[in-house]
């Protein structure tokens, strides 16, 4: 993490790229309609996973990082939630401006929901019905490991638990803000009680 709180990630795929179709089928056999599959492009066979999950009427959330041809080989019309930063948003749309990224994604994939994270500039949620913005939770960034996972996990848990997208965006932002203020990956992820307390303090 540099002095501005930004991170630099080096990826070594290892076992992440050793999935087989048989293994995917076995795992997905335990899930059905309305269950959630969360994907990041650190594993292989994401196109196959998307297709099988869609057939089962699952909710499909995707973070297309690291962005490469494997993402474009997927039928992205099947994605329920896109979690992207400005770089991935530009790769999907060819646009740099956040407003144009949101418009571009929804033009291509009108049934999807987009969560666009902009680092210190906050985050946006957009779908065919509208958009909402959430500023960052200002903290001293100590370690950004697991911040994105914390954000997406809390957002999905919140919105699927009945919160509005705006409420879910706030909850996710608070949770990831707490996470970056601590060292480590899993140990940095706050409990639901911690997040609820912090959200209450902000009201």
Where do the language-model regions lie?
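Structural alpha-helical scaffold elements that stabilize or flank donor/cofactor-binding regions
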Residues: 29-30, 74-75, 107
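Conserved phosphate-binding/catalytic region of the ribokinase-like
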Residues: 69-70, 99-203
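Conserved N-terminal subdomain of the carbohydrate kinase-like
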Residues: 1-36, 51, 56, 196-203
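Conserved beta-alpha-beta core of the PfkB/ribokinase-like small-molecule kinase fold
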Residues: 36-104, 122-123
């Amino acid at each position: 993490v540099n002095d501005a709180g930004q991170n630099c990630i080096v990826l070594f795929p290892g076992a992440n790229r050793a999935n087989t179709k048989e293994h995917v089928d076995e795992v997905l056999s335990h899930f059905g309609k309305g269950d959630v599959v969360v994907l990041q492009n650190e594993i292989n066979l994401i196109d196959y996973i998307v297709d099988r999950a869609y057939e089962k009427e699952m909710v499909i959330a995707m973070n297309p990082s690291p962005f490469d041809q494997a993402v474009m080989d997927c039928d992205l019309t099947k994605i329920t939630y896109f979690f992207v930063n400005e770089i991935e948003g530009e790769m999907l749309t060819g646009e740099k401006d956040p407003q144009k990224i949101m418009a571009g994604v929804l033009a291509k994939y009108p049934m999807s929901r987009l969560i666009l994270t902009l680092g210190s500039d906050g985050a946006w949620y957009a779908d065919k019905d509208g958009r909402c913005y959430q500023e960052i939770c200002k903290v001293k960034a100590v370690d950004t490991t697991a911040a994105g996972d914390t954000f997406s996990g809390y957002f999905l848990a919140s919105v699927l638990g009945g919160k509005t997208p705006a409420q879910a965006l706030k909850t996710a932002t608070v949770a990831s803000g707490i996470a970056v203020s601590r060292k480590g990956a899993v140990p940095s992820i706050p409990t639901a009680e911690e997040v609820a307390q912090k959200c209450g303090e902000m009201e």
